[in-house]
């Protein structure tokens, strides 16, 4: 494929940032399910032993949060809701049958919902996780607070897992999306179809640099 037929969607640092977050999520989610459901205790072996999993789980969670915060500051301005997103949401039936609508920028309304849901649930996980983190912080809180934090942590964890499952499904559903995060590039045709406004902005910037 000729270079002019592709567009850089994610740079190497952006992709590394994404996959660090993804790797930490897998470790935290799998070990967390082992904590939450007794029948899934064997999942904790992903970190070695159940005892080691209980020690490492919160540290992995902190790394995941820190990594996602970097992503947040990189992309928050691309995820602000606008009129095109409302139009996109109103035509969700067309989206389901793989028909693109509206003048979508770098991210569509669905991707923006995933982004904001992820940051909300990650904040809840961090706050509740700190409260229940033994032996460092839990002793500073009362039993009722710890119990509430445990429920909140469990809810936020399951909710985030669902959000990420939707994220993965959408990435697999839209052909060419995985390539963007693995290799960093997308075809011009892909960009024109799925993110026309972003495509025009990138082309305009590229043309200015070439002058």
Swiss-Prot record:
Cytoplasmic side stretches: 1-17, 73-112, 171-211
Gene3D superfamilies tied to this protein: Transmembrane di-heme cytochromes, Chain C (1.20.950.20)
GO MF term (any one): metal ion binding
Sequence intervals crossing the membrane: 18-32, 54-72, 113-130, 152-170
Membrane disposition: Multi-pass membrane protein
Keywords tagged on the record: Cell inner membrane, Cell membrane, Electron transport, Heme, Iron, Membrane, Metal-binding, Transmembrane, Transmembrane helix, Transport
Record-linked SUPFAM superfamilies: Transmembrane di-heme cytochromes
PANTHER family, A to Z: FORMATE DEHYDROGENASE, CYTOCHROME B556(FDO) SUBUNIT (PTHR30074:SF2), FORMATE DEHYDROGENASE, NITRATE-INDUCIBLE, CYTOCHROME B556 FDN SUBUNIT (PTHR30074)
Protein name: Formate dehydrogenase, cytochrome b556(fdo) subunit
Annotated organism of origin: Escherichia coli (strain K12)
């Amino acid at each position: 494929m000729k270079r002019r037929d592709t567009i850089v969607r994610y740079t190497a640092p952006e992709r590394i940032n994404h996959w660090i977050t993804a790797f930490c999520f897998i470790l935290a989610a799998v070990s967390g399910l082992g904590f939450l459901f007794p029948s899934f205790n064997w999942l904790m072996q992903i970190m070695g032993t159940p005892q080691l999993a209980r020690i490492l789980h919160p540290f992995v969670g902190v790394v995941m949060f820190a990594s996602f915060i970097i992503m947040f500051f990189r992309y928050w301005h691309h995820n602000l809701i606008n009129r095109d997103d409302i139009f996109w949401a109103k035509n969700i039936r067309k989206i389901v049958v793989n028909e693109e609508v509206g003048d979508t920028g770098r991210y569509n309304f669905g991707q923006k919902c995933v982004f904001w849901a992820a940051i909300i649930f990650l904040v809840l996980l961090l706050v509740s996780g700190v409260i229940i983190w033994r032996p460092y912080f839990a002793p500073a809180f009362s039993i009722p607070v710890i119990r509430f934090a445990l429920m909140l942590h469990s809810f936020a964890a399951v909710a985030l897992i669902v959000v990420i499952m939707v994220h993965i499904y959408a990435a697999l559903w839209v052909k060419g999306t995985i390539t963007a995060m693995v290799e960093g590039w997308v075809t011009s045709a892909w960009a024109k179809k799925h993110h026309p406004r972003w495509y025009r902005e990138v082309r305009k910037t590229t043309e200015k640099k070439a002058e």
